Amino acid sequence: MSDEIFSTTLAYTKSPKATKRTSFQDELIRAITARSARQRSSEYSDDFDSDEIVSLGEFSDTSTDESLVRKKMNDFHISDDEEKNSPRLSFLKTKKVNRAISNDALDSSTPGSEGSSPDAQEDVTGDSLPKSQNDDREVGREIITVKPTPRMHPVKRSTSSGETSSGLDADGHFKPSPQPRSMLKKSSHTEEGVRPGVDKEHSISEASAPTPSLPRQNGTELQTEEKIYSENLDLEDSLLQSLTSSSFKESPGGCTSPGSQEKVPIKDHDGEPTEIWDSLLSNENEGSSVLVNCVTPELEQPKDGQVAADDLEEEREKGGFTEDDLTTDPLLSTSPSVITPTEPAEPAKKANEDRNTKNKKTTNNRVSSASGRLMTSEFLKRSGPTKRSPSAATSSHYLGSLKVLDQKQPRKQSLEPDKADHIRAAVYQEWLEKKNVYLHEMHRIKRIESENLRIQNEQKKAAKREEALASFEAWKAMKEKEAKRIAAKKRLEEKNKKKTEEENAMRKGEALQAFEKWKEKKLEYLKEKTRREKEYERAKKQKEEEAVAEKKKDSLTAFEKWSERKEALLKQKEKEKINERRKEELKRAEKKDKDKQAISEYEKWLEKKERQERIERKQKKRHSFLESETHPPWSPPSRTAPSKVF
C-alpha cells in the first residue's frame, strides 16, 4: 500500500473502462495528500521557522541536483471521441469532494500577500459564490480520459543526492519505489541568483533521460505515512476537485507529439512548435489515437519577492490576461508570470502561436474564475480562527490556485521527493495544457470542415438552382408550344360548337312550329271529346232518375202491405197475452192453497216431534241413573286403583 502511495512512477497500465481517473492522477493526488497531511500535523508545533518554508519557487531550474535528474517521457493516448465521452465524477464522489473541500480548502491555499485584509477576501468570496457550482460543472465536462502506457524505468545513479539507486528485482521487472522525504536538499536563493539566464529549452534526448531510482523508506516511516493517509482520506478527494479545476489555469509547455519528437525541441511554457500540430492533424485524419509525450518542464522562480508594477503589466500582456481578469479572479494575481518565447519565430509559427494563445486564454479565463471562486468560497465556512503560517514571498507554479505545498515545514526534511511531486504535477499540467490546445485545434478543424461542407452545400444548391432554372426555361418553351397547340384546338372546337348551336336552333324552330300545329289539333280533339262526355253523362243521369222514381214507388206499395200485416199480428199477440195472464192467476191461487195445507201439516208434525222429545229426555235421565252403579274399569294386577264414581 505504501509503495503505491509514494511511487515515483507516473502511470500504470489500467483500462479506462475500469476507472474514470488515470493512475497518473491517483498517484499525483496521493503524493500531494501525504505532503499536506504532514504539514497539517506539524502546523501547530513551535519548532519551525519562516526560513523553512518550502515552495516550488525555491528549486532552481538549472541546479546540479536537477541537471542529471530527468523524467522519462510518458505516452498518453488521446482517443478520437474523447470530447463525446468525457468522464464525469459519480454522485457519491462529487458529494464527498464537496464535503472535503469545505473542510480543507483553506489549509491547501495561502493568501496572495500578507497585507490583504479579511474584508477584501470576504468581498471576493461573496462575488464568486453564486457562480461556483456552474463553473464546477463546466470544469467537470472538460476533463478527458487518458489511457497511459507504462514504461520501464532504467536505474541511473544520482549525483545530487549522493546515494546509490536501488536495482531491478530478480525477475527483471522494475518495481516503483517510494520517495524518502529526507533525501532532498533545499535550494538556496544564491543559486537562483547565479543562474537566472540559463536556457529554458530542452531537447528530446535530455527530456527522455531515465529517472534515478530512490531507496525505499524504512518500516516506521511507511507506517506513519499509511496512518496519515488513512486519516486524511477526505483531503484526497478535495484535492482531486481542486486539481481538476486548477489544471486548466496554468499554461505550461513541454509536450510534443510522437511525430515531432525527433524534429523540434521543446519551447517555453507558451511556445508551440508547428510540427506538433502537423503530426497531430495527420494522425487525426488517419483516424488513429494520438500519443502525446510530456517532458519535464522548467520551473521558473522570480528573483525578488515583490515585482514592480511595470513588470507585472508586461507579464499580463504576454500571458494574455487583462486587468479585468485579474480583478475578477484574485487568484490570478498571485499566480506565476507567464513566460513568452524569446527566440524569433517564423510567420507561420507566429500565426499558430497566436491561435494557440487565444485558445489558452479562453480556457484559462473560464477555469481560473471557477477555481478562484471554489477556493475563496471556503474562506467563509471556517467557524473558528485557525493558526496560519506566514505567507511566502513566492507562490507555487505547478497547480495554480492549489497551494498545498506552500505551507511551513515543522522540521528540515529532504526536498528531493517533494521536488519529484512538483515535477510530476508540472508534467501532468503540461500534458493537460497540450491536450487542451490540441482539442481546441481539433474543434477549429471541425469548424473549418463544417464551413467547407456548408460552402459545398451552398455550391450544390446553387448548381441545383441553375439546373432548375434551365429546366424551367425548357419547360416554359415546351409549355408555350403546347399552349399554342391547345389554343388552335380550342378555336376549332369553338367553331364546331357554334355550327352545332346554329343547327340546333334551326331544329328547335321547326320543332316549335310542329308543336303549335299539334297543339291546335289536340285542342279541337279535346273539345269534341268533352262535348261527347257531357251528352253521355246527361243521358245517363236521366236514366238513373227514372230508375229511382220507380224504385221509390215500389217501396211505398210494399210498405203499405207490410204495415197491414203488422197490425194484424199485433192484435193477435195482445189476445195471447190476456190468456196467459188468466192462467197465471189461476196457478197462484192453487199455490196459495197448497202452502196453507203444508203449513198446517208442518205444525202438526212439529207438535208431535216435541212431544216425542220430551218422552226421550225422561227416558235418558232414568237410564243414566242406572248406569252409574256399574263396575270400575279394568286395571293391571300389579297396581291397585281406588274405585271412583264417574
From Swiss-Prot:
One of its GO terms (molecular function) is microtubule binding. It comes from Mus musculus (Mouse). It is found in: Cytoplasm; Cytoplasm, Cytoskeleton; Cytoplasm, Cytoskeleton, Spindle. InterPro entries: MAP9. Residues 75-226, 242-418, 491-511, 531-554, 570-597, 609-646 are annotated as: Disordered. The modification N-acetylserine is found at residue 2. Residues 105-119, 157-167, 205-222, 280-291, 330-340, 386-398, 637-646 have a biased composition (Polar residues). Residues 188-204, 346-357, 405-418 have a biased composition (Basic and acidic residues). The gene is Map9. Keywords: Acetylation, Cell cycle, Cell division, Coiled coil, Cytoplasm, Cytoskeleton, Microtubule, Mitosis, Phosphoprotein. Residues 442-596 form a coiled coil. One of its GO terms (biological process) is mitotic spindle assembly. This is Microtubule-associated protein 9. Involved in organization of the bipolar mitotic spindle. Required for bipolar spindle assembly, mitosis progression and cytokinesis. May act by stabilizing interphase microtubules. GO terms for cellular component: aster; astral microtubule; axon; microtubule cytoskeleton; mitotic spindle; mitotic spindle midzone. The modification Phosphotyrosine is found at residue 12. Binds to purified microtubules via its C-terminus.
